[in-house]
């Protein structure tokens, strides 16, 4: 748990510091996927075998788009591919790779640099075989995005 607390501190530090601007990596358009949803669901399996081969940006952006991307085009691209309570967008997706920790920013399709340390082994806890996976996605609930709204909502109910 200490390692997770360290990551929380890293993330809090990232949010607390506005300057200097963190380096960003723009990712390509996700592109069309060739498999139907039915086929994807039929082929879905859990596996404990992980390759350490890097994931190319084209595949990574497709995974991130499915995990928390924007659907639609142009001005209509304001809805997430995943549900969010009252459109609060309270969950952030962090990409943990050998070259550090990055925040996924779906509105701009970029990875924003957070921390330079390779933290992948810190997320294995009871599954050490996971540490060789080239990418870990970490979902972080940002309570600050909902705190005031939840208080207002609770007051209306009472």
Where are these regions (language model features)?
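N-terminal amphipathic, basic helical "cap/leader" segment at the start of enzyme domains
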Residues: 1-133
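Small-aliphatic-rich amphipathic alpha-helix that forms the alpha element of a beta-alpha
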Residues: 44, 63, 93, 135-158
